[in-house]
Each structure stands twice: as C-alpha cells, then as structure tokens.
Regions:
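Bacterial Sec-dependent N-terminal signal peptides
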Residues: 1-25
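Beta-propeller blade termini and top-face loops
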Residues: 25-747
Length: 747
C-alpha cells in the first residue's frame, strides 16, 4: 500500500508581518492589532485605484499591496479574536514541551510509524528559479571559503567550501527567520544571529517584529544559546544589524526597530543606547570607536564605540524613508548613502561624504537604480522599504555596487550608474535573482549577494555572476501536489520563486512565475495539472508538466481570488468521463478536460473569497467550499448548496482544511487555526445538521493547517501544524508528534 502525503509542505516561513509604509509598521510599539493595521492599510489605498490595480499586476509583483496580502493571508487565521497577536513566546514554550514529548514518543512508536523524513528539494536550482530568500551574507575576515547566509525563513546556513555545499544547524531553533549574521573578528567560531525578518517580514514566527533576539554560538554554529538581548514578551521587535568590535570583541552593537543595543560583556547583558527605528550600521574602517547608523532620513554617529550617538547634519531630505550606508578602507573618511523615498519607495538619491559626515554632496538622482526595469525608468510599486543595499570596493572608492530589485554599478563614486544584473534571464545582462538584500566585497574583485533567490557571486567585479544557491534548503512553499501514478512527480508553489516541477530525484524546473500558490494533479491521469500564482492566476498542462498555458484567472471570472486561491480535481459522476476541476474565487468555478469554465455557485456576501475546497473521493459530485463567512456542501456538482453547521464556537473563518474519508462521504474532519485548545473535529453525518466529535486530545494549542487521511489504515490522520507533523489513529486515540528529521517549521 502506498500513501503519498501531500500535506508535507515545508514553508520555512510564510508571511508574518508585512513591512509596509512606516505608518503601517509597528516601530517598536507594544501590542499591535491586526484589525487596526488592516483597516489603516485599506483606508490609505482604497482610493488609489491605479496603485491597487497595478499592484496586483503580475509584472509588478513586489508592490506594497502584494506584500501586505502575503501578511494578511497568513495572519487573519492566527490572531486572537480581538485582533491581538499571540505572544511570540507561546510557540517557544510549546515547542520545548513538544520536543521533550517527541523524544519520549520515539521510544513508544511502532517501528513502522517512526518518521523517515528526507529532503526532496529543490536543491539544484534551475536558471530563472531560486532557492529562497537570503537577507544577509557574512564572510569571516581572512576566511574566504566560509560563507554564512541568513535566510528569511530557513535559519542560518554555512558553507566551508566557498558555496559549493551548505549545511545548517538551526533547524530546531525557536525561529527560522534571520536578518543579519556576523562572527567574532578574533574567533570565527563565535557567531551571532539577529533573528526575525526585519525588512521583508515574510517569515515564520521569528519574523519582524517578532524577533526572539540575538542568539550566539561558540562552536561555529553547532549549538546556539540566547544572549541577554532576549525578547520574551510581546515586544514586537525587529533586529536589522549586528556588529562586533574588532579589537574588543566583548562590545556588540545590535540595531533594530527600537534602537541600538550595546553589550560590553560578549552578549551577557545589553543596554539601549539609542532609541529609533534603525535600519543600517557600519564601523569606520580605520577607527573601531566610530560607528554610523541610519534611522528614517537621518544618519547618526558614535565616537565612543556605540555608547553615545549624535546626528550628522546632512542634506538628505526628510522625505527619505530608508537609508543604506557603506564605507571602505580605500578612503576611511568616506560614507556612502543609498536612499529610498518614504511612501513611494523609489530612488531618493545617492549621497556621499568624504570627511566623516561633516559635509555631504549628492551624486546621481536618476535613473531609478532601485527599480525593476533595465532602463531605470519605472515608477510604480517601488520597494526601497524591502530591498536596499550597497557595497564599495575595498581598494577603489569609486567602484560601487547597489542592490534594489536589480544590481547597478558605478565607476565614478556614484555620479553615474549602469545596470549590472537583471532579474530576467537572457536580457543582455548577467542574471541574478530579483530583490537584492545584501552586497559584500570579499576582496577587490569578488562580490557576494543575498537575494530573494539565494546567494550569487562574481569574481570579476560584476562581469559574470554565478549562482551558489544549490544545496540551500530554504524554499518557502505554500502548497504542493504529488502524482498518484508517478510518485517522483511533485509540484510545489513557493513564495518569491514561482512553481517548481519535480520529475525525479534532483530534477526540478520552474514552470510558473510570480509567487507559486495552489496546484493540483489529476489523480486519475497525471498528464493534467494546474499551477497558479497569487489571487488565482492559473496555468494548465495537458502533457504531464512539460508545458503550461494560461487557464482560469480573474479576467475570466471577473472575481478576484484569495491570496492562495484553491483548486481541486474531483471524480466525474459520468462513468468513464474525465475528472472535473473546481477553482474557488468569490464563487466556485468548474471545468472538465476541455478547459471551459462555468460558475457553479451563487454564494451570498460577495466580498468574501473562497479559501478552501475539498471533494469526497467516494461520491462524485460532493464538494465543500469554504470562505471567511461560511462553508457550503454540494452533492450534485454545484447545482445546489447547503450551509454546513459547525460546533458551537467554531466559525468558518478559522477552519484551515477539510478531509473526507476515502470510502464514506458522510465522514469528514476539519482542522482549526489559532491558539485555542479545540483543534480537530470529526462528523459522521456530513451536511447541514452534522454532529461533531472533538478529536483534539494530545494536540497542543497551536494552529493546525492541514489534515490527510491514510487509506487502508486504522483511521490514521496526519496533521500539519505550526510546529510540524502529528498523527493519531484508533490505537493512539491522541495526537503524537511525528517530526523526527524535520526542522522546526510550519507545515
């Protein structure tokens, strides 16, 4: 008997706190409220029709609207009923308890039920694809073969051979998001991680502003401990930068959305030395007592190793919202500043000082070097709030590289710029994945970068770039499907990196762009497949994944889909007929193998979009459709629908999945999000007057995101949760951890 568990989608991060225009960010405020943020965002942009429409355009995928929708989709099922966010340490505490419980369960499980998880990929990254988002890169001084990568949703990764292979030891940390990483200049085995996701904020529970603080390793990353910068409460902190003094390595500076924190004892204790939303920090190359920091439109200086800070008087206008800075040993008095305008988030100008910040002049203000097109002429949906970085050659202060959506290069100190890399392959420029978050010179000719797709390197000052992302297991999957005829065939939709198709071991290719979302493979004939990007832009294959063409989308339905728009194959009631396909927008749409779509529902409340679809394998025509307000069931392929009644206190808005029994359509299970104690229910009489049994015993109070039933088993269910996988059956009667070999991640 074969069972292919399609629930195992390792998000390695899924949207948390979208770092929008600062008026929607938290900026260190206590107890942000989901509904307040949501209301403020839509109020600001509801009248900007041109902005809203272009933000949804696939070609403009990185607008603020786009990032906000990532965040909203993830959190609307996880916040408390009053809109408050759960305390960051809830999962930490539960995780530690469940880890101890998991160790005990290993000794009690039957041999056949012991997990045997292994990575399927993608580990070999195709051209035009990507591994996942890398926020920061660090190379210890004098050790060019050692590379540390800070993944937005996959923890910290280390290469000891210049990026040929990668390893991680952070799979069991309480957060999988890392913004910045550095090592002790005197001892590279001492490593510091600034946890969370300060800029993109699309990360698992360590995301901005839910950082758990600064963590430390003294053995090269084999083990990790918490430092004195330890966020135990609902602190809403986002850490952006960590620096270690080069001669007195007991001094550590950490920048974040609540200021600059300084330790003088190697991280045992910290004191806040500056209050503000700090985005970047650098040390003066020839004087370790002098540090620079940026906050909003201002640059600050400390002349006593970070103890006291004063503002540098520059001519940078107050309309600037974010500044990235760089220094170089080739001209130690120089400071270079790349800026983005607040609100529009396009290029705000390139500024430079050659006397330690006393005087400033402006280099280029055009073209838009942080935009998306080759010419730098685009103006819509800019994202200087998200990706903004700069690096200056260590031996030539005129050679400067900056990162936005692409990489641009200047050979005259920032007065003029030319595009160096482009986010689309084969366009006359070297290809580097879109959205550049970090740039670092390793030496005078070698530069390394972290992007939404992973890690890339040039050894000839940008003439050619090599992707080093193979082996980085940090892809942020939303959904996956597996062929029931060819178990090697897998489709997965991933954040930032489209939809990937696996045809065999280590054989992956990207088949659909945008953010990869839901997908489906016909269980009867796997030559039929569907893939999608955000809000229901579907592609269809009729040749087993060799090619895909556009299928249903909001232009056809005149209905916008949910951020993750569901699609479902279902058996046809006509004997021998091809499978049916259902897609959920505001209503349910249906097609057969011919590909013609028809609406098959007319639900009330047209403002609510369908979040879930599920069919009964044993009874053709039986389908459940669920939106934020209600859930409905049909037994006749959508001709008539009945509203489902759930247990008291369980609303459709917090249901995350429906799973039918494979041979009895009267039985199905539901899973519940949020942090309450009621997590899984079963009904034996599906319909409008269903009765329910609570099957939550043994499940911790965490979001349960999906359920799968194992055929030909003693009613064995698997549950994907915010803390991995659990299972239960008639012999266990309670949920048992099933995580041996899995990282600590959302399933």
């Amino acid at each position: 008997m074969k069972i292919f568990l399609s629930l195992i989608v390792l998000f390695f991060a899924i949207p948390l706190i979208a770092e929008k225009d600062p008026k929607f960010r938290f900026d260190g405020k206590e107890s942000p409220n989901f509904f307040d943020i949501q209301k403020a965002f839509y109020k600001e942009y509801s009248e900007k029709t041109d902005f809203m429409q272009s933000s949804k355009d696939e070609s403009n995928k990185e607008g603020m609207f786009y990032h906000f929708k990532r965040w909203e989709w993830f959190w609307k099922q996880r916040v408390l009923p009053d809109g408050e966010f759960p305390q960051p340490m809830i999962l930490q505490d539960i995780y530690q308890k469940e880890l101890r419980r998991s160790q005990k369960s290993k000794t009690e499980q039957a041999l056949s039920l012991k997990p045997n998880w292994k990575i399927l990929g993608p580990t070999n990254i195709p051209i035009g694809g990507g591994a996942g988002r890398v926020n920061g890169i660090h190379i210890p001084a004098g050790q060019q073969n050692i590379i540390w990568a800070a993944a937005a949703g996959g923890g910290a990764w280390k290469s000891t051979n210049g990026g040929k292979t990668w390893q991680t030891t952070t799979d069991k940390l309480g957060t999988l998001g890392v913004t910045d990483i550095t090592t002790d200049p005197k001892n590279p085995n001492i490593v510091y991680l600034a946890t969370g996701d300060a800029f993109g904020a699309d990360t698992y529970y360590g995301a901005a502003p839910f950082s758990i603080g600064l963590i430390k390793s003294v053995d090269g990353g084999l083990t990790w401990t918490q430092t004195g910068l330890n966020y135990q409460q609902k602190d809403t902190r986002a850490l952006s930068r960590v620096l270690v003094h080069p001669t007195n390595t007991s001094i550590i500076l950490v920048g974040g959305n609540n200021g600059i924190h300084r330790s003088t004892d190697g991280g045992v204790t910290f004191n806040t030395r500056f209050v503000g939303d700090v985005k970047d920090m650098e040390m003066k190359p020839d004087d370790p007592s002098v540090y620079y920091a940026t906050s909003g439109s201002k640059i600050y200086i400390s002349r006593d190793a970070g103890d006291k800070w004063t503002e540098l008087k520059s001519n940078i206008p107050t309309t600037i919202g974010r500044i990235a800075i760089a220094v170089t040993p080739a001209e130690p008095e120089a400071i270079f500043a790349l800026t983005a305008k607040r609100g529009s988030w396009d290029f705000g100008g390139f500024y430079r000082s050659y006397d330690g910040g006393e005087n400033w002049d402006i280099g280029a203000t055009t073209p838009n070097i942080i935009g998306r097109n080759l010419q730098g002429t685009d103006t819509e949906n800019q994202q200087g709030w998200y990706d903004l970085c700069i690096a200056v050659s260590p031996d030539n202060p005129d050679l400067i590289f900056i990162g936005g959506i692409n990489i641009w290069r200047s050979t005259n100190g920032g007065s003029n710029w030319s595009i160096n890399t482009y986010w689309v392959p084969n366009q006359g420029r070297p290809y580097v994945h879109a959205d550049v978050h970090d740039l670092d010179f390793i030496n005078s000719t070698t530069i390394i970068t972290g992007t939404d797709g992973g890690v890339s390197l040039t050894t000839n000052r940008g003439l050619a770039w090599t992707d080093l992302s193979d082996g980085l297991e940090i892809t942020q999957f939303y959904r996956m499907s597996i062929s029931q005829q060819r178990p090697d065939v897998v489709i997965g939709g991933a954040q930032d990196n489209g939809t990937s198709y696996r045809s065999g071991p280590n054989e992956w290719k990207q088949v659909w762009g945008g953010d990869g979302m839901d997908n489906a493979i016909d269980p009867v004939n796997d030559k039929y497949m569907f893939v999608s990007s955000q809000n229901g832009n579907f592609g269809r294959s009729t040749n087993g994944g060799s090619s895909f063409s556009s299928s249903i989308n909001s232009a056809i339905t005149s209905e916008e889909g949910e951020w993750v728009t569901p699609i479902e194959f279902a058996p046809n009631a006509k004997p021998g007929a091809a499978s049916l396909v259902y897609a959920g927008y505001r209503d349910v749409w249906k097609t057969d193998s011919l590909g013609f779509w028809n609406k098959t529902s007319n639900f009330p409340n047209k403002q609510s979009r369908i979040m879930l679809l599920a069919h009964a394998p044993s009874r053709p025509g039986t389908l459940i459709a669920s939106n934020f307000n209600a859930s409905y069931i049909t037994y006749d392929e959508g001709q008539t629908w009945r509203q489902i009644q759930f247990p008291n206190g369980i609303a459709s808005s917090i249901i995350t999945s429906f799973e039918f029994h494979p041979s009895n359509d009267s039985i199905f299970w539901i899973s519940i999000s949020g942090f309450g104690s009621r997590k899984v229910f079963q009904t034996n009489n599906a319909g409008t007057n269903s009765t329910w049994t609570d099957l939550s015993g043994g499940m911790p109070p965490i979001p349960v995101n999906c359920l799968r039933y194992q055929p030909n088993s003693p009613d064995r269910l698997y549950a994907g949760t915010d803390l991995g996988v659990y299972y239960r059956d008639n012999s266990t009667k309670v949920w048992i951890p099933y995580n041996d070999g899995l990282p600590n991640t959302v399933i």
